[in-house]
Amino acid sequence: MNIDKKIVDDLVANDISFVTTVPCKQLAGVIEEVENRDEIFHIPSNKEDEGMGLCAGAFMGGKRPMIIMQNTALGVTLNTLATLIQFYRMPLPMLISYRGELREPVSCQVEMAVHTKALLAQ
């Protein structure tokens, strides 16, 4: 079975009905599969914190939301996670790709990988 299809099948099986995504090379197959599913309302976001706001609205509107993003934006989203998602106790599954390890062609991704590990360790 195709892993992208399996991931999205599991989202549907768990009643995820709203997904927002930020472009991500590693998760492009999952994003394409989400886009092609009638069971999921998909809204691409310009930025990760914008996507979290969309997910908050979807949750308040009775949907089960999720966001798909890269780890390099984790730092940008901390304020939104703390002051909106966590403060109001909104469940928000997040599928996050991980960049910045060996052979990473984009140097700024490597720097953020170091910070990602530190943030997740807290």
Walk through the language-model features, giving the residues of each:
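Thiamine diphosphate
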Residues: 1-122
